[in-house]
Amino acid sequence: MVNMKASMFLTFAGLVLLFVVCYAPESEEKEFPKEMLSSIFAVDNDFKQEERDCAGYMRECKEKLCCSGYVCSSRWKWCVLPAPWRR
């Protein structure tokens, strides 16, 4: 009984997929989902990480100095929060 339900679900899902593929015969209509996804996942310039002269938390501190509030870990060479046991 469960196997029959699964096969019916897969058949129905296949028919829905076939309908979606055949529904947009023109290339302009096929581009709509791509445009929608690209607009949803577009990265705005305001949200991009900016280059700094210092390294932030968990960044390599080999070439760059750590930003204020962080110290360079002597073991891992990452910028970490200062703590009494890390001095």
Swiss-Prot record:
GO CC, one annotated term: extracellular region
Compartments (UniProt record): Secreted
Positions of disulphide bridges: 54-67, 61-72, 66-79
Pfam family, one: Toxin_12
PROSITE patterns, alphabetized: HWTX_1
Main location: secreted
Stored InterPro entries: Huwentoxin-1 (IPR011696), Huwentoxin_CS1 (IPR013140)
One of the record's GO molecular function terms: toxin activity
Keywords annotated in UniProt: Disulfide bond, Ion channel impairing toxin, Knottin, Secreted, Signal, Toxin
Tissue: Expressed by the venom gland.
Domain of life of the native organism: Eukaryota
Proregion span(s): 25-52
Cleavable signal peptide: 1-24
Family affiliation: Belongs to the neurotoxin 10 (Hwtx-1) family. 51 (Hntx-8) subfamily. Hntx-8 sub-subfamily.
Function: Ion channel inhibitor.
UniProt comment concerning the protein's domains: The presence of a 'disulfide through disulfide knot' structurally defines this protein as a knottin.
Protein name listed in UniProt: U3-theraphotoxin-Hhn1a 3
Native species: Cyriopagopus hainanus (Chinese bird spider)
